[in-house]
Amino acid sequence: MKRKISSIFLILAGVSCVAMAAGNKPVSYPDGYRQWQHVKSMIIQQGHPLHGAFGGIHHLYANRAAVAGYAKGTFPDGAVIVFDLLEANEADHAIVEGARKVVGVMHRDAKRWAATGGWGFEGFAGDSATNRVVGGNAATACFECHRPRAADQFVFSRTRP
């Protein structure tokens, strides 16, 4: 019985240490990202397989390190890519931006986030810089979709010539 309790205690202590370590590695909200280089925009409409999670207007932004990564094909540590997702509303025969749904962030640090391809992932709900929607679930919430893009350092987007 003592052995079982000791084993359970060690497992719980290990889980707590892992959780604390993960808590020390949050991806920061990218203040001023809309002043960074705009990479691309797109609209995911009804009928697209990702519409449920990502339907709306997307704008992608890159900091200087990420811009260099797009140019070289290799993203250095410190590269940050922001996925700004807004509702797509129709008005007067035009598709216009509605409320912000989420600000998704990929932050490159090969050592810090080795388990997720060298990228830290986070999503911030709506216009909040503090309401995190990914947290400790980056491996399943984000990286599983990015995993097939290993040859491109797990990045889907490309810059236009």
Identify the meaning behind each predicted range.
Residues 1-7:
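Positively charged n-region of N-terminal signal peptides that target proteins for export
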Residues 17-23:
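Sec/Tat signal peptide C-region and signal peptidase I cleavage site
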